[in-house]
């Protein structure tokens, strides 16, 4: 009888252990294989981690969306939401019990003590260097340097292929990118998030008006009346997701100004989504590259 009891208890313990192991497997970024349990307080750092195959245990969400960015959401199904980057949910962060917290220097502010009281805190200046530099820095922290180098190598190779496809469509034409919101019309500058992928990675030539924009600002608000002055051969268009922005673009398309644009007449207007194109991260840029490849392969 005692033997049966012992055997029964042993089986129970084994079953519980197996369940525990399964739960650990399903928990994102638990401390295994030397990878710390990470809380990311930047959507861009989160997406850099995803590019390295690491799903953070917790992450902030997009401020406007109040959710993970659409192109990353599926990969973050087991990641705990920690509020928005500008105002993280400290209670959720504390409950997460991370091993390390990744913060964006610009959003974190000067007082890092509240984070350091919870866990070791790593600060990243996302205004310094490129997404490649950010990826490499993160890779050092998580022992994924080889993976980062390979990711960048693959990206650069694909960028060359897409660049060739674009050349066949646009030739030596000059390009600009605009964004339509409910209240504004914006022209993107050479600065991130849009500038680097269009004018550096994909080698497109910006119109003269874009070159003259303030390089410290990501965009400049303009009136639709000055659109013809840019004289673009091709235009990339981002329209905000809300209904008012969508309606604003439909109204713009009906105007004589829009219909008279060189790019419109040449049928070289290319609609692109805000995400992943405006997510200046390793993951965002790669997905934008994939979209460009599909767009210009048609």
Where are these regions (language model features)?
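Proline-aspartate-enriched helix->loop->beta-strand connector
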Residues: 97-102, 120, 227, 231-235
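Bacterial signal peptide processing site
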Residues: 20-23
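Extracytoplasmic substrate-binding proteins
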Residues: 114-183, 268, 279-298
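C-terminal motif of bacterial Sec signal peptides marking the signal peptidase cleavage site
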Residues: 15-18
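Structured C-terminal subdomain patch of bacterial secreted/periplasmic proteins
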Residues: 233-298
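Extracytoplasmic ligand-binding site segments that recognize negatively charged/polar headgroups
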Residues: 68, 126-137, 173-197, 214, ...
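A short, structured surface patch at a secondary-structure boundary
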Residues: 43-92
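Basic- and aromatic-lined ligand-binding clefts that recognize polyanionic substrates
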Residues: 37-49, 150-207
């Amino acid at each position: 009888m005692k033997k049966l009891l012992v055997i029964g208890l042993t089986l129970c313990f084994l079953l519980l252990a197996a369940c525990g192991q399964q739960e650990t497997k399903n928990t994102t970024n638990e401390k295994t294989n030397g990878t710390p349990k990470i809380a990311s307080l930047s959507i861009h750092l989160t997406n850099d981690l995803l590019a390295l195959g690491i799903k953070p245990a917790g992450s902030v969400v997009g401020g406007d969306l109040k959710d993970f960015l659409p192109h990353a959401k599926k990969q973050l199904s087991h990641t705990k939401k920690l509020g928005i980057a500008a105002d993280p949910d400290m209670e959720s962060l504390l409950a997460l019990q991370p091993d390390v917290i990744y913060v964006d220097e610009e959003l974190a502010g000067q007082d890092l003590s509240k984070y350091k009281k919870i866990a070791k805190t790593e600060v990243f200046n996302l205004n310094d260097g490129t997404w490649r530099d950010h990826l490499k820095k993160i890779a050092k922290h998580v022992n994924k340097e080889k993976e980062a180098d390979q990711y960048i190598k693959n990206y650069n190779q694909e960028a060359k292929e897409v660049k060739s496809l674009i050349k066949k469509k646009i030739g030596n034409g000059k390009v600009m990118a605009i964004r339509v919101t409910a209240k504004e019309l914006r022209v993107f500058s050479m600065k991130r998030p849009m500038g680097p992928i269009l004018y550096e990675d994909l080698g497109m030539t910006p119109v003269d008006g874009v070159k003259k924009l303030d390089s410290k600002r990501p965009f400049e608000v303009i009136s639709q009346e000055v659109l013809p002055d840019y004289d673009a051969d091709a235009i990339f268009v981002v329209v905000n997701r809300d209904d008012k922005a969508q309606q604003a673009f439909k109204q713009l398309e009906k105007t004589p100004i829009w219909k008279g644009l060189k790019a419109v007449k040449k049928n070289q207007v290319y609609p692109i989504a805000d995400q992943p194109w405006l997510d200046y991260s390793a993951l965002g840029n790669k997905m934008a590259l994939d979209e460009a490849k599909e767009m210009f392969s048609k």
